[in-house]
């Protein structure tokens, strides 16, 4: 929830979700 994964999720889901990232405020975060 606090580490940005350097990916946005405005139009498409987080590709980095496979690494444990999730969408938050249109940006992909981890932990």
Swiss-Prot record:
It holds the Pfam family Cyclotide. There is a cross-link at residues 1-31 (Cyclopeptide (Gly-Asn)). Signal peptide: none annotated. One of its GO terms (biological process) is defense response. The keyword Cell cycle does not apply. Disulfide bonds join 5-21, 9-23, 14-28. Coiled coil: none annotated. The presence of a 'disulfide through disulfide knot' structurally defines this protein as a knottin. Probably participates in a plant defense mechanism. This is Cyclotide mden-L. The lineage of its organism: Eukaryota, Viridiplantae, Streptophyta, Embryophyta, Tracheophyta.
